From Swiss-Prot:
This is 2,3-bisphosphoglycerate-independent phosphoglycerate mutase. The keyword Isomerase applies. Disruption phenotype: Cannot use, as a sole carbon and/or energy source, a wide variety of hexoses and intermediates of hexose catabolism. The keyword Metal-binding applies. Its EC number is 5.4.2.12. Catalyzes the interconversion of 2-phosphoglycerate and 3-phosphoglycerate. Essential for the growth and pathogenicity on the host plant. Substrate binds at residues 125, 155-156, 187, 193, 259-262, 332. Keywords: Glycolysis, Isomerase, Manganese, Metal-binding. CDD domains: iPGM (cd16010). It comes from Pseudomonas syringae pv. tomato (strain ATCC BAA-871 / DC3000). Its cofactor is Mn(2+). Pathway: Carbohydrate degradation; glycolysis; pyruvate from D-glyceraldehyde 3-phosphate: step 3/5.
């Protein structure tokens, strides 16, 4: 194995995409002398961090979880959204043994099928097309009583956009000749992830016992009444639609969210016999199915089992005796550890982790530097003492300040990043180390919505930069994706990539 400079640093600038448009582009509006110099003097190009290139449906913007999973895996990791969509298209979904078993059991006992989930086209936690497919499956399996418990979005979709989704489900049930919307409630209640059990209990009691502050003849009528009360989709209060459709013993309950974090709490209320976070009036004995595995500790089957990733970058470095540091502030710590390691919580042998607390402010536009200076102090110290073969760092600023929609703060955020990158590259030059600079997805390069003129707070589908910083004569090939970053790092370290990594190095000899 050839001797390699020490260390190799992967700098992930979260939410730092590339756009030629100056409109609302915090990166082009900022003074970034370090990045400007690197773009002029170092091999660089653009790589893709969205859509099929990261295992998402075509055109779907990337996100931090997906981005880090692809960066660390060295292969395109097909996301749950894509797996479910593909299964529906192929017809496999309608034969899914876990869902079919639960539905068949309910049907043979003359019981109901309850479908619940986030009803929107946001594609972040769920997709309405999946709920349509579930209704079709229930009808195909002979169910007569099919009830939809719709959680309304307004967070990954515009604040008042649920009407078309409710109409889609009404049309679906009319076409199928069976089924109806039974309840509507905002995701604020049904999809909490911070142990706010008062909210979750409101959703649970609505679904199980039709216990509701409001009721309406149709889903759309219930929504319009909520708007009249000045409630946006996310905050729509518990509303029963039509006659009560309570959950009874022997019913099937299928939760159609594919993302786990906001589906765990409500699921636990349904399935845990020793649940103690609030007093349940009733716990019906149901055939419960999670669309994906929300947590290994939850005693319920999942329709799509979690896949495990072998020989991700962290594991392969450890197996080859290399040391590594993972470092980020709180907001992105899970991404640079758990997600970058392919969904593994524990560190690999020779892996150290540093968590820098994120600042305690209401929103990060109030402190756009976040904890980047403290993160950088630790990295510079680690480089100077040459403690690790590889350092992997995430800077949260571009994404977290980008989500605020406030342009001035976003400009300050990326200017702080430029200073931090300068400190790291200066330290590396002194010890003969190297760096790769990239991002997981875009955000801060688009702070205004061209269509509406309003603040743009979401991620983008723009490509992200890729920069090599070091002494080697290399150039960046075109067509790279996030999955190519780990193989590139192994090339720089003089290591063969494992066969599980299907990505290819982005750097080629000049």
């Amino acid at each position: 194995m050839t001797a390699t400079p020490k260390p190799l640093v992967l700098i992930i600038l979260d939410g730092f995409g590339h756009s030629e448009s100056h409109e609302g582009n915090a990166i082009l509006a900022a003074k970034m002398p370090v990045m400007d110099r690197l773009y002029k003097t170092m091999p660089n190009g653009l790589i893709s961090g969205s859509g099929m290139d990261v295992g998402l449906p075509d055109g779907q913007m990337g996100n931090s979880e997906v981005g880090h999973m692809n960066l660390g895996a060295g292969r395109v990791v097909y996301q749950d959204f894509t797996r479910v969509t593909k299964a529906i298209r192929d017809g496999e979904f309608f034969e899914n043994p876990t869902i079919c078993a639960a539905v068949d059991k309910a049907v043979s006992a003359g019981k109901a099928v309850h479908i619940m989930g986030l009803l929107s086209d946001g594609g972040v936690h769920s997709h309405q097309d999946h709920l349509v497919a579930m209704a079709e499956l229930a009808v195909r399996r002979g169910a007569d009583k099919i009830y939809l418990h719709a959680f309304l979005d307004g967070r990954d979709t515009p604040p008042r956009s649920a009407k078309k989704s409710l109409e889609l489900m009404d049309e679906t049930f009319a076409r199928l000749g069976k089924g109806r919307i039974a309840t509507i409630i905002g995701r604020y209640f049904a999809m909490d992830r911070d142990n706010r059990w008062d909210r979750v209990s409101t959703a649970y009691n609505l679904i199980v016992d039709s216990s509701a502050e409001f009721h309406a003849a149709t889903g759309v009528a219930g929504l319009e009444a909520a708007y009249a009360r000045d409630e946006n989709d996310e905050f729509v209060k518990a509303t029963r639609i039509g006659e009560p459709a309570n959950v009874e013993d022997g019913d099937a309950v299928v939760f159609m969210n594919f993302r786990a974090d906001r589906a765990r709490e409500l699921t636990r209320v349904f399935v845990e016999d020793d649940f103690k976070d609030f007093e349940r009036a009733r716990q019906p004995k149901v055939n419960y199915v999670m669309l994906t595995q929300y947590a290994a500790s939850i005693p319920a089957p999942s329709a799509f089992a979690a896949g495990s990733l072998k020989n991700v970058l962290g594991e392969y470095l450890a197996d080859n005796g290399k040391t590594q540091l993972r470092i980020a502030e709180t907001e992105k710590y899970a991404h640079v550890t758990f997600f970058f390691s392919g969904g593994r919580e524990e560190p690999f042998p020779g892996e150290e982790r540093i968590l820098i607390p994120s600042p305690k402010v209401a929103t990060y536009d109030l402190q756009p530097e976040m904890s980047a200076p403290e993160v950088t102090d630790k990295i510079v110290d680690a480089i100077e003492h040459q403690r690790y073969d590889v350092i992997i760092v995430n800077y949260a600023n571009g994404d977290m300040v980008g989500h605020s929609g406030i342009m001035e703060a976003a400009i300050k955020a990326v200017e702080y990043l430029d200073v931090c990158v300068g400190r790291i590259t200066d330290a590396l030059e002194k010890v003969g180390g190297e760096a790769l600079i990239t991002a997981d997805h875009g955000n801060v390069e688009q702070m205004t919505d061209d269509a509406t003129g309003q603040a743009h707070t979401a991620h983008t589908s723009e490509p992200v930069p890729f920069v090599y910083v070091g002494k080697r004569q290399l150039k960046v090939r075109e067509g790279g994706v996030l999955a190519d970053v780990a193989p590139t790092m192994l090339q720089l370290l003089g290591m063969e990539k494992p066969q599980e990594m299907t990505g290819h190095s982005i750097l080629v000899e000049e």
